[in-house]
Amino acid sequence: SKDVEVIDIGEMSVVPGFIDSHSHLPWSGDRTNELAMRLRGKTYREIAKSGGGIMKTVRDTRSTPKRNLIASGISRVQECIRNGTTTLEAKSGYGLDLDSEVKLLESISEINRSTDIDIRATWLGAHDFPPEMGREDYVEHLISDQLPVISELSLAKWVDVFCEEGWFTNDQTEDIVKAS
């Protein structure tokens, strides 16, 4: 048709933007050594029992100031953009206690305001069990303490639970999801 503009892009391609449906933007620490452990056949559970895994990142993230989490998150988003991502879901989950989970979700909100990408925040308070609280007490804490605050502050529209053997059970997951 005469009304269609044709743009010659030579040997290049036009593709839709990528959507990253699972990311953690604000976090701190380094677990690259765990990749080699996985390649040698270690299970995630074995790595966690040896002091690695989620709790390693939780320890590092809890002690990191929010401004540093935001700066590193923005850097990660810029890399995503360079690689074609236009939308991503960003999970919390490396704080576990209320103050740290709020810090992570506020960081995600600030990263979203500071970058040219569509970021959707997900609360993942049920990522692991913190050492300072028993499992059932923690599930109750998530439902009674964290969820109401996260909801009141409108920090996340979605909820995720790490439902896997050794972590949250099907029943615990169902209780958390129903409460959300």
Residue ranges and their predicted role:
Residues 2-3, 155:
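Short glycine/proline-enriched coil/turn segments at helix->beta-strand junctions
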Residues 3-72:
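Metal-associated gating/positioning segment near the N- to mid-region
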Residues 57-72, 78, 86-180:
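Metal-coordinating catalytic core of metallo-dependent amide/deamination hydrolases
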